[in-house]
UniProtKB/Swiss-Prot annotation:
It catalyses: cob(II)yrinate + 2 L-glutamine + 2 ATP + 2 H2O = cob(II)yrinate a,c diamide + 2 L-glutamate + 2 ADP + 2 phosphate + 2 H(+). It comes from Herminiimonas arsenicoxydans. Catalyzes the ATP-dependent amidation of the two carboxylate groups at positions a and c of cobyrinate, using either L-glutamine or ammonia as the nitrogen source. Residues 242-426 form the GATase cobBQ-type domain. CDD domains: CobB_N (cd05388), GATase1_CobB (cd03130). This is Cobyrinate a,c-diamide synthase. NCBIfam families: cobB (TIGR00379), PRK01077.1 (NF002204). The a and c carboxylates of cobyrinate are activated for nucleophilic attack via formation of a phosphorylated intermediate by ATP. CbiA catalyzes first the amidation of the c-carboxylate, and then that of the a-carboxylate. Keywords: ATP-binding, Cobalamin biosynthesis, Glutamine amidotransferase, Ligase, Magnesium, Nucleotide-binding. One of its GO terms (biological process) is cobalamin biosynthetic process. The active site is at residue 325. The gene is cbiA. Pathway: Cofactor biosynthesis; adenosylcobalamin biosynthesis; cob(II)yrinate a,c-diamide from sirohydrochlorin (anaerobic route): step 10/10.
Length: 438
């Protein structure tokens, strides 16, 4: 099965579905681990801005998982990321988002942009021959290159036989039986891999269970990707700067591309753990507290006095701080958890964060800056009540309405907006080094 391919060429498939909840992440993880067992070099990407699915996929594949989105990441950077991966591996799996044609841009748009064939995951738990009608509809709604179907949650051999009879003119690339142990979820999506008991055993079981039709697999032609493997030249606007980044189970929502962007701008990165009550590293010139699940760790964070004191001291010294989503939640005066208990927090911004019983912010957004448009997204279940007036607001891509508030307190920037740094490296650099001249 090992492929001898030209440079920037690999067997690439985009794994999509008719909706969320069909098992795309489960199937992609199972397929990645299975192919790696067979001696193939595999890289996985995730369509859209999600943080959690990539963590599972990274655990399954053993390699960093990057986001692909034609708007947030951009066409050129998507091409560069794919071409770089294709020069290094045999197989690229791209997990889509929502349904195949959902969103603007959709997973189908991404597949068409790079000539990538699509494989659709269908949850057959409550269907049989009707699966064929669904496949036919996806074909006709296109156009996409529909290279195959992966049928998930088959109950028995007879169920598989009925499903197979219903699908015409499209190969069944793989099948996966109903799983006894599914990947668990919570309010922001799948849980983080380290929270799943015996996660590697679960992933190995999925790899054992997925059955691949190697004839159908080998019929998928490699995709050749043109374009430079190098990122666009970035000014060394952060040369000589050290950025301290919170990284632990409470603050894990960081794009690998964001770290690359900071390094490309010349920054040195140092990581520390608020959950372990670690102080900001002494050599830090700026601090980044990213998003995550601080609401699940209120007691620990509220009692982490050494970390809290170091944050307050940095703020008093006017050290640049970016507190992003979950990061902003912990730098308010207090955080009210899902059970209604109030926990004292760092107090760099006056006000209170409270968990809500429903989604409080969602969608792709952009922030206009003096350096250009910084793109990203929001996805949160809490709200901030504060007397501080926002310095700016993001704009929702879907309708042009106001999105998330951006607060400034000295050199502190706080917002629910998750920025994709490479969409505007100069604006990103200015957050961490406000003295940069325009």
């Amino acid at each position: 099965m090992v492929m001898s391919s030209p440079t920037n060429s690999a067997r690439i498939i985009l794994i999509s579905g008719i909706a969320s909840g069909q098992g795309k992440t489960t199937v992609t993880a199972a397929l990645a681990r299975k192919l790696i067992r067979q001696g193939l070099r595999v890289r996985v990407f995730k369509t859209g801005p999600d943080y959690l699915d990539p963590m599972i996929l990274q655990r399954a594949s053993g390699a960093e998982v990057y986001a692909l989105d034609l708007w947030m990441v951009g066409l050129d950077d998507c091409r560069r990321l794919l071409a770089r991966a294709a020069s290094e591996v045999d197989v690229i799996l791209i997990e889509g988002v929502m349904g195949l044609y959902d969103g603007d841009p959709s997973s189908a748009d991404l597949a068409r942009a790079f000539g990538v064939p699509v494989v659709v995951v269908l949850d057959a738990a409550k269907m049989a021959q009707t699966v064929g009608a669904v496949v036919l509809g996806l074909q006709q709604y296109g156009p996409v290159d529909l290279a195959g179907v992966i049928v998930n949650r088959l109950a028995s051999p007879s169920h598989a036989s009925m499903v197979t009879r219903g699908i015409r003119n499209v190969p069944i690339l793989a099948t996966l039986p109903k799983q006894q142990q599914a990947l668990p979820e919570r309010h922001l999506g799948l849980v983080q891999p380290d929270e799943i008991a015996q996660v590697d055993q679960v992933l190995d079981q999925l790899a054992d269970q997925i059955e691949i039709d190697m004839v159908a697999w080998d019929a998928i032609a490699p995709v050749v990707l043109d374009g430079s493997l190098a990122a666009a030249s970035t000014q060394q606007l952060l040369a000589g700067k050290t950025i301290a980044i919170a990284r632990d189970a409470a603050f894990a929502f960081v794009y690998h591309a964001n770290l690359e962007c900071l390094r490309a701008a010349g920054a040195q990165l140092k990581f520390f753990s608020p959950l372990n009550d670690e102080t900001i590293p002494a050599e830090a010139d700026a601090v980044y507290i990213p998003g995550g699940y601080p609401e699940l760790h209120c007691a620990t964070l509220s009692s982490a006095q050494r970390w809290q004191d170091s944050m307050r001291a940095a703020h008093v010294r006017n050290m640049p701080i970016l507190a992003e989503c979950g990061g902003m939640m912990v730098i308010a005066d207090s955080l009210i958890d899902a059970q209604g208990k109030k926990w004292p927090m760092v107090g760099l911004i006056p006000g209170e964060v409270a968990m809500q019983g429903k989604l409080a912010g969602l969608g792709m957004q952009s922030l206009a800056t003096e350096d250009g448009e910084l793109r990203g997204h929001a996805f949160h279940y809490s709200t901030l009540s504060t007397p501080v007036e926002p310095q700016a607001q993001t704009v929702k891509r879907s309708n042009g309405a106001h999105g998330e508030a951006v607060y400034k307190q000295g050199a502190l920037t706080a917002t629910y907006f998750h920025a994709y740094f490479s969409s505007c490296p100069a604006a990103t650099a200015r957050i961490f080094s406000p003295e940069i001249k325009a």
